[in-house]
Amino acid sequence: MNVKARKEILLIALGGNALIRKGQAGTVSEQFENLKVPIGQIARLSRDYRIIITHGNGPQVGNLLLQQECCDAVPALPLEILVAQTQGEIGYMIESTLDSELMELGID
């Protein structure tokens, strides 16, 4: 019986400020661009480790809260819903960028 050695687990935390750099407006295209370097490094690390990625969302949820407060035409959403929205948004950006990097490196 050929038993494959299990890879060690590596936990990586990306702060919300890793996606929005100082002086940037925080557009989605800027955030995707800012993810390329750290996600490229994570993709390469995945050859040797099982990866768990966690992330913050402070700047993103703050921006969404400001958007909510700027419009009286629609009901504002509570903060916990905005947190969930931005977590999903950032999770999608990470997953999409990671998938592209893994395909480029030929990693399943």
Q: Could you say what each language-model-derived stretch is?
A:
Residues 70-108:
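Ligand-binding beta-strand-loop-alpha-helix segment within the catalytic cores
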